[in-house]
Amino acid sequence: MTFPIEKVRADFPVLTREVNGLPLAYLDSAASAQKPNQVIDAEAEFYRHGYAAVHRGIHTLSAQATEKMENVRKQASLFINARSAEELVFVRGTTEGINLVANSWGPENVRAGDNIIISEMEHHANIVPWQMLCARTGAELRVIPLNTDGTLQLDTLPSLFDERTRLLAIAHVSNVLGTENPLPEMIALAHQYGAKVLVDGAQAVMHHAVDVQALDCDFYVFSGHKLYGPTGIGVLYVREELLQDMPPWEGGGSMIATVSLTEGTTWTKAPWRFEAGTPNTGGIIGLGAAIEYVCALGLAEISEYEQNLMHYALEQLADVPELTLYGPANRLGVIAFNLGKHHAYDVGSFLDNYGIAVRTGHHCAMPLMTYYNVPAMCRASIAMYNTHEEVDRLATGLKRIHRLLG
């Protein structure tokens, strides 16, 4: 079946606008994806006619809002095939989800002399929390090195793991290189050593189906705003037996069972004890609409369309003089590049003049920039609403910039 690209594009109102007098070509979805009408309308309808504080309310609006919120928890659990909706914690995004694990599970399980393994391709959100945990506990942070093609040096893994390895924290897909890591093999190896595995799924869930049970990971986290949903909402999956033993890392309303000035405080059960304060209910409802939207299109169909477009893009960009591409031939979602010796900021500014939105900078992956010995890269994203014509405009724009700047 042909992917309904025109119908999809019609659902995203921003795609009708112009930038610098030209149609917008939005190639920055890996930073944050645009939102379809279905998501915008679902959140707006909630605020117009259904808003109330959730939990403990006896009135109709509160009960209905609570039901809607918890239904999205169930919906999200099915989306990633968790065993139970109660294995999912609503968080502000991937960054908060990783920090939750580092600050709740981490101090209970990581000691001086232990080690945590990450990779050289990680986003800062999957580096800095572990650096902070290691600094507090005296644990060692070990790093899986990169190959020049943007894949990991998997042959180094046996030398990195040992009986003191407590956690492997790894990107499902690199936000810069588009590398999809071989998670089943990596997770199986980690478990052989008794280590837990956290997967940063921020760049994966919008491109193909994710099954946390099949992966056998212990933690999986993703953001709503990259999945065509609202900002300020994400999901942390934690294997049930781990979640039940984790203490809360934030205190406040909603996460308590009892509070006494003389007897102290007891916590409510998971996952709610990790959701202190008033939740982003509107964002949660918008996330549910985003999940419903991509599932209605079909993740297999989205994946096929995007992969075909990615292959086309790589073919077109191969004809751009002095263009350096970073990452493996088989990649998901992103194309990182530099043009000659020109700074990524300059190239991105020229592309913006042509109505083309790309991301420039270090992409919250400074160690990766250090590995490639560059201060920055340009990054074009391939999403389900992008077209062959937009790819052509990118290639043509880069050729034009090369002619202008030499």
Curated annotation (Swiss-Prot):
Co-factor requirement: pyridoxal 5'-phosphate
Active-site annotation: 364
UniProt entry tagged with the keyword Lyase: yes
Alphabetical list of InterPro entries matching this protein: Aminotrans_V_dom, Aminotrans_V_PyrdxlP_BS, Cys_dSase_SufS, PyrdxlP-dep_Trfase, PyrdxlP-dep_Trfase_major, PyrdxlP-dep_Trfase_small
Assigned EC number: 2.8.1.7, 4.4.1.16
Transmembrane segments: none
Catalyzed chemical reaction(s): (sulfur carrier)-H + L-cysteine = (sulfur carrier)-SH + L-alanine; L-selenocysteine + AH2 = hydrogenselenide + L-alanine + A + H(+)
PROSITE patterns in the record: AA_TRANSFER_CLASS_5 (PS00595)
Positions of post-translational N6-(pyridoxal phosphate)lysine modification: 226
Keyword line: Cytoplasm, Lyase, Pyridoxal phosphate, Transferase
GO MF annotation list: cysteine desulfurase activity; pyridoxal phosphate binding; selenocysteine lyase activity
Pathway assignment: Cofactor biosynthesis; iron-sulfur cluster biosynthesis
One Gene Ontology term, aspect cellular component: cytoplasm
GO BP: cysteine metabolic process
Location(s), subcellular: Cytoplasm
Subunit architecture: Homodimer. Interacts with SufE and the SufBCD complex composed of SufB, SufC and SufD. The interaction with SufE is required to mediate the direct transfer of the sulfur atom from the S-sulfanylcysteine.
NCBIfam families: PRK09295.1, sufS
Family as reported in the entry's similarity comment: Belongs to the class-V pyridoxal-phosphate-dependent aminotransferase family. Csd subfamily.
Functional note: Cysteine desulfurases mobilize the sulfur from L-cysteine to yield L-alanine, an essential step in sulfur metabolism for biosynthesis of a variety of sulfur-containing biomolecules. Component of the suf operon, which is activated and required under specific conditions such as oxidative stress and iron limitation. Acts as a potent selenocysteine lyase in vitro, that mobilizes selenium from L-selenocysteine. Selenocysteine lyase activity is however unsure in vivo.
Name of the molecule in the record: Cysteine desulfurase
Organism, scientific name: Citrobacter koseri (strain ATCC BAA-895 / CDC 4225-83 / SGSC4696)
